[in-house]
């Protein structure tokens, strides 16, 4: 899909969910600075593919390489280069957004100070919810807590995002699109699913799973 040397390479992937084969023979390469959008109807395996590319799920067949090395050989090192945000962020309902964000960063080994976390949460639209317990947040607000990690300048080369624009207003969509574009401009890689159009600096390459479905 990209002609320059790939950072992420996958060959002949197959995905089985229950007794249903979602896709097979799926190959892709993503070069430094590229953004890849995974498209396709619901039920075609978009989230499953993201989890496979992150090493969080095993493919039925095929191989994934990061910078030329199979991720299966050293998942721990691979995960240190990865920032994955699923569609349902795991939050502790007893903690505030700020506490949840700081906990997530610490768990991932990222050293981020409190002021930076506050700034990120304000930027994503949670200024009025900083001190509220997560249990009272809406689903959209819960997602924003997870997305705030993208505004912290964390040095992770590969960002994998499942529907990051859901429940964001137009200003937040534009701000997030700029952040993703900036990450790619700095040589990072973004792989995402989204049903929304976003004002990216460069339109992403699209992989449509309906074209490779089993």
Swiss-Prot record:
All copies of domain ABC transporter, residue ranges: 8-212
Enzymatic class: translocase
A Gene Ontology biological process term: cytochrome complex assembly
Substrates-to-products reaction catalysed: heme b(in) + ATP + H2O = heme b(out) + ADP + phosphate + H(+)
Membrane topology according to the record: Peripheral membrane protein
Pfam family, one: ABC_tran
Keywords for the protein's UniProt record, in alphabetical order: ATP-binding, Cell inner membrane, Cell membrane, Cytochrome c-type biogenesis, Membrane, Nucleotide-binding, Translocase, Transport
UniProt EC number: 7.6.2.5
GO molecular function, one term: ATP binding
InterPro entries, per database record: AAA+_ATPase (IPR003593), ABC_transporter-like_ATP-bd (IPR003439), ABC_transporter-like_CS (IPR017871), ABC_transptr_haem_export_CcmA (IPR005895), P-loop_NTPase (IPR027417)
Superkingdom of origin organism: Bacteria
GO CC annotation: plasma membrane
SUPFAM superfamilies: P-loop containing nucleoside triphosphate hydrolases
Protein residues bound to ATP: 40-47
Localization of this protein: Cell inner membrane
Record has Glycoprotein as a keyword: no
Subunit organization: The complex is composed of two ATP-binding proteins (CcmA) and two transmembrane proteins (CcmB).
Summary of the function given for this chain in its UniProt record: Part of the ABC transporter complex CcmAB involved in the biogenesis of c-type cytochromes; once thought to export heme, this seems not to be the case, but its exact role is uncertain. Responsible for energy coupling to the transport system.
Family according to the record: Belongs to the ABC transporter superfamily. CcmA exporter (TC 3.A.1.107) family.
Name of the protein in its database record: Cytochrome c biogenesis ATP-binding export protein CcmA
Species whose genome carries this gene: Aromatoleum aromaticum (strain DSM 19018 / LMG 30748 / EbN1)
Organism lineage: Bacteria, Pseudomonadati, Pseudomonadota, Betaproteobacteria, Rhodocyclales
């Amino acid at each position: 899909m990209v002609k320059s040397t790939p950072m992420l390479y996958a060959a002949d992937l197959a995905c089985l969910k229950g007794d249903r084969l979602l896709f097979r023979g799926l190959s892709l390469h993503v070069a430094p600075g590229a953004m890849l959008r995974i498209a396709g109807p619901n039920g075609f395996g978009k989230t499953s593919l993201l989890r496979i590319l992150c090493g969080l799920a095993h493919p039925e067949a095929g191989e994934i390489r990061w910078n030329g090395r199979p991720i299966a050989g050293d998942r721990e090192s691979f995960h240190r280069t990865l920032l994955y945000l699923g569609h349902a962020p795991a939050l502790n309902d007893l903690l505030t957004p700020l506490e949840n964000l700081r906990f997530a960063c610490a768990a991932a080994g990222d050293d981020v100070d409190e002021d930076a976390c506050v700034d990120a949460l304000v930027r994503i639209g949670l200024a009025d919810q900083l001190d509220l317990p997560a249990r009272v947040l809406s689903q959209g607000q819960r997602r924003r807590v997870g997305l705030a990690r993208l505004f912290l300048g964390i040095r992770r080369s590969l960002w994998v995002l499942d529907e990051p624009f859901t429940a964001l207003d137009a200003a937040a969509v534009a701000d997030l699109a700029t952040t993703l574009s900036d990450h790619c401009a700095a040589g990072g890689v973004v792989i995402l699913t989204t049903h929304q159009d976003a004002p990216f600096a460069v339109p992403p390459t699209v992989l449509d799973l309906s074209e490779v479905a089993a």
